[in-house]
Amino acid sequence: TFPNTPETVGSAREALKKALADDGTDIVIENSAEYRIDDLFARELEAERLMTLPNNYILIENPFVREPGNLDSVIFDLQVRGLRPILVHPERYSYYYKHPERYEVLHNAGAMFQINVLSLAGGYGKDERKIAEMLIEKGLVDFVGTDLHNAAHADIIDRYLASSDYLK
């Protein structure tokens, strides 16, 4: 679990802004957070301390081991609060592979999906790529993003974007 609070993310944003200014780079830096559905998330939700994207989009993620038992109610509660949940990298949750109908249930319940371009590029494996492509074919993908953590990820994305796989 990452402590994605306004304080921790805000201080990181300020440090980045300072480094960019010191380098002479003039760009606007805003912040949000990706929230794993866990106890910290529940506390931040109740305290109304969640950082959202424009238009009240909120990035949520499941643990990789198993779906949270309260996922359906979290999706509902977020919408009741006027938030628009985006479930990030759903293609990486292997517990859905044997139950792909669960993707449609979640999407129909109001969870938008953001797949990871690294999955499409094969950066996480064949299963993740296959599921990402299936989600696209079924019209369940609302956004494409990335968990770009290092230069190797950038290289994988560059190769993918230059490939015939991307062009189809």
Task: Give residue ranges: language-model regions.
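Extended substrate/RNA-proximal surfaces in nucleic-acid metabolism proteins
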Residues: 3-113
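Short, ordered loop/turn segments at secondary-structure junctions
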Residues: 90-92, 118, 148-149
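His/Asp/Glu-enriched short active-site or ligand-binding loop at hydrolase and phosphoryl-transfer sites
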Residues: 110-122
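Glycine-rich, Lys/Arg-enriched anion-binding loops that position phosphate/diphosphate groups
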Residues: 111, 127-128
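Short active-site-adjacent structural elements
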Residues: 121-125, 132, 151-157
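Alpha-helix termination/capping residues and helix-transition junctions
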Residues: 129, 137-138
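Short acidic/histidine-rich active-site segments
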Residues: 138-156
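Mid-to-C-terminal alpha-helical segments outside catalytic/metal-binding sites
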Residues: 158-168
